[in-house]
């Protein structure tokens, strides 16, 4: 299976570095200019929870969306804007284009990728699937359009458990890709028969149970929130496990005033916004400074800046294109996910 080279990771950090922080005047200029361009071009900005707070705030201010990847896909699909600007990583832009082939999809940069996407080349993954033709292929949203086209289902961390549980109840066996930690978590929770691809998120894989136990000893009254892309030993220490949106909901509902959070620190913007009376602490990674690869923030998410956002709008640059031959195959598993989650929402509303 493909391994992500340290060179790629180091380069991502270098690319993500900001030349210098913006002054208050510069920030105000970019925010105003971007808002004007969005309005003039009938465009909407959607941003992931892991983007820098300034990008998330701008999406909210301009009538866009800040959410997890499932809601980003749903919002972009339902919004009437002719142009969707996706602040996130490349697979999110591709997903928006697959679901809305008639729309123009722009990104602040096309260099913002994902270690899960990079670690699951379509030729290798397809060969793996071909060895087990009897199995249903379920892939995480953090994959290329080509890998999605090879799948039967696409899932996000907010709906993966329910979808796999449903497939298991139907007697289906599963190939899962690419995140091995999320796959292991789902396998343990559902008891499903799953073959796992060997991929990992560079942010979540760095959280370590020993350091987390030490931190819990320092904050004994704190609750621990963990994203399921983390290693099993970290998940086992959690008071709540879930997707970004589920962790935000847990932060609101748990009585604890201090929360240790094992996911990308970009999520703190929304948590602090919704829970201003609570204290949020980053879970420790394997190292600090130069010793850690991600240091609890995705280097590719950090590439989404105000400067790049304005530039892509003014120039029409960094447009996402997906091979038209792939779209019919890739949209099928995505629509299955959206239909499944919509049906689950309606059922929940009916039971309320």
From Swiss-Prot:
Subcellular location: Cytoplasm
Family matches, as Pfam families: NadA
SUPFAM superfamilies reported in the protein's UniProt record: NadA-like
Enzyme Commission number: 2.5.1.72
Cofactor remark from the record: Binds 1 [4Fe-4S] cluster per subunit.
Pathway membership, UniProt: Cofactor biosynthesis; NAD(+) biosynthesis; quinolinate from iminoaspartate: step 1/1
InterPro entries to which the protein is assigned, alphabetical: NadA, NadA_sf, Quinolinate_synth_A_type1
Binding site for [4Fe-4S] cluster: 114, 201, 298
GO molecular function: 4 iron, 4 sulfur cluster binding; metal ion binding; quinolinate synthetase A activity
Any GO BP: 'de novo' NAD biosynthetic process from L-aspartate
Highest taxon above the source species: Bacteria
Entry similarity comment: Belongs to the quinolinate synthase family. Type 1 subfamily.
Protein task: Catalyzes the condensation of iminoaspartate with dihydroxyacetone phosphate to form quinolinate.
Protein name per its UniProtKB record: Quinolinate synthase
């Amino acid at each position: 299976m493909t391994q992500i080279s340290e060179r790629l990771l180091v380069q991502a950090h270098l690319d993500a570095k900001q030349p210098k922080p913006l002054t208050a005047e510069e920030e105000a200029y970019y925010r105003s200019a971007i808002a004007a361009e969005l309005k003039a071009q009938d465009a909407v900005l959607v941003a992931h929870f892991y983007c820098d707070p300034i990008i998330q705030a701008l999406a909210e201010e301009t009538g866009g969306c800040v959410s997890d990847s499932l809601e980003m896909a749903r919002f972009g699909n339902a919004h009437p804007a002719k142009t969707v600007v996706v602040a996130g990583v490349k697979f999110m832009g591709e997903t928006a284009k697959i679901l809305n082939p008639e729309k123009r999809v722009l990104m602040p940069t096309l260099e913002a990728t994902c270690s899960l996407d990079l670690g699951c080349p379509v030729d290798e993954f397809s060969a793996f699937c071909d060895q087990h033709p009897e199995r249903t292929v379920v892939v995480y949203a953090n994959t290329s359009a080509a890998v999605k086209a090879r799948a039967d289902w696409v899932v996000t961390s907010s709906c993966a458990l329910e979808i796999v549980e449903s497939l298991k109840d139907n007697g289906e066996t599963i190939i899962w890709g690419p995140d091995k930690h999320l796959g292991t978590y789902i396998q343990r929770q559902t008891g499903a028969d799953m073959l796992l691809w060997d991929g990992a998120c560079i942010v979540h894989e760095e959280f370590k149970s020993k350091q987390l136990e030490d931190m819990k000893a320092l904050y004994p009254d704190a609750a621990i929130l963990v994203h399921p892309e983390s290693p099993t030993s970290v998940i086992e220490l959690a008071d709540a496990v879930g997707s970004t949106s589920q962790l935000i909901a847990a932060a609101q509902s748990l009585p604890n005033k201090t929360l240790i959070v094992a996911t990308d620190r970009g999520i703190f913007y929304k948590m602090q916004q919704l829970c201003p009376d609570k204290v949020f602490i980053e879970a420790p990674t394997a190292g600090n400074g130069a010793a850690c690869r991600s240091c609890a923030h995705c280097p590719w998410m950090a590439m989404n800046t105000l400067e790049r956002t304005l530039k892509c709008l003014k120039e029409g640059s960094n447009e996402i294109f997906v091979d038209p031959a792939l779209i019919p195959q890739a949209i099928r598993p995505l629509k299955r996910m959206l239909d499944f989650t919509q049906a689950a929402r309606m059922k929940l509303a009916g039971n309320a």
